[in-house]
Amino acid sequence: PGHGEGATEKGDLESWDEVNKTVQDSFRKIESCDTKILFGHSFGGQVALYSILSDLVNPDYLILSAPTLGDNYPNFVKKLSSGIAKIAPKLRIPSIVNKKNLSTDIDVVNDYFNDPLVFRSMTARYGREAINTQNFVNDNINNLKTPTILFHGENDTIVPIASSSKLSELENVEYVVVQNSKHELLNQDTRPFVLSELHRWLKNNNII
């Protein structure tokens, strides 16, 4: 899976503007398309929601898979993140992802942890920016008007399913709870079900 090859330092960014630029540059490539769909899994879901809610991009449809509207980092760490980022911006904070909570497929787990492009930690300033944007998304989630399908695994402990509760209640959001699923909805035995539900939603919206 990896986290990309472009970054000079994995799991680090000076400001969220770097993320905004990447999203906008990528979205320009599909702006001429008749139907523009944004897909975001996990942290990518948070990025997609932030980009829409801050009017950076305006897709026609949105597909979300376990977006990070919450997490299992200790509250005291999150509360201290801003101060830590100022004092020690490059202090590394370990990832909460482990071999037990990622996927029900052992091969997927092994591939993930053997991939040199996957980072196992983030800097304090990265964490600060992630928390700030997560808060922005949660505070403004009622402003989301884009037709959306939201998937979340019932047994997800990386991004607790309860964090999708407010988003799932919006009229423009179709919510699909994936039973017996960990975080990697599309990379385990739940993949056929998720793809089937996605196909149904795409057909119902006359996208395919």
Where does each model-flagged region fall?
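Short beta-strand immediately N-terminal to the catalytic nucleophile in serine-hydrolase-like folds
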Residues: 38-40, 65
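Alpha/beta-hydrolase
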Residues: 91-140
